């Protein structure tokens, strides 16, 4: 099973979340997201979803809700980047709950931004030919889609990191431990002993110390036995 190193995933998450924050700040600073051409006068008016207020010729009240969603996504992304940085520096634990929290916040921020930009485009299409003649989007609008992609990628990497940790806890065994276990299993063999044979008969040799009559008298007392086993 292929396992991506956790440090590489955390470094990629820091890079993606930091890039998303920079893109959001750039979108906040630049106000020319779209150019509105009103009906009465042909002067172009720039507008941005970060403003919240609408031009006098476009009485749209729901733009404030879009601005709040954009600001909420920026705040969540800052906290998300902080959590990922603390995790990368081992200041918080590397458990499964932290990975799930980072993945959830990343997906939530990306979905919130996507919903806000979809609502903004819907309001532009709704106001077209009613309050203004036409509108033209600028290049800065496409940075919000790149920001959404960065947040979704960060969430996917967090879930991959969580999956790696779960798989490592359940199935993965360190190389040294697995090799030692394999060596132990290979070296341990059951050696069966042969059945015990019957005891050999003993050969008893009788020796007498003194020949003749005296030897026969003291034979019971001075008799010695030498036992040899026939192998």
UniProtKB/Swiss-Prot annotation:
Residues 1-13, 93-99, 161-231 are cytoplasmic. It is found in: Cytoplasmic vesicle, Secretory vesicle, Acrosome membrane. Signal peptide: none annotated. GO terms for molecular function: protein phosphatase 1 binding; protein phosphatase inhibitor activity. The keyword Membrane applies. Its main location: membrane. The chain crosses the membrane at residues 14-34, 72-92, 100-120, 140-160. Expressed in testis, specifically in spermatocytes and round spermatids. Keywords: Cytoplasmic vesicle, Membrane, Transmembrane, Transmembrane helix. Residues 35-71, 121-139 are extracellular. The keyword Membrane applies. Pfam families: TM225 (PF25452). It is a multi-pass membrane protein. One of its GO terms (cellular component) is inner acrosomal membrane. A motif (RVxF) lies at residues 225-229. InterPro entries: TMEM225 (IPR033542). It comes from the Eukaryota. Probably inhibits protein phosphatase 1 (PP1) in sperm via binding to catalytic subunit PPP1CC. Interacts (via RVxF motif) with PPP1CC. This is Transmembrane protein 225. It comes from Rattus norvegicus. The lineage of its organism: Eukaryota, Metazoa, Chordata, Craniata, Vertebrata.
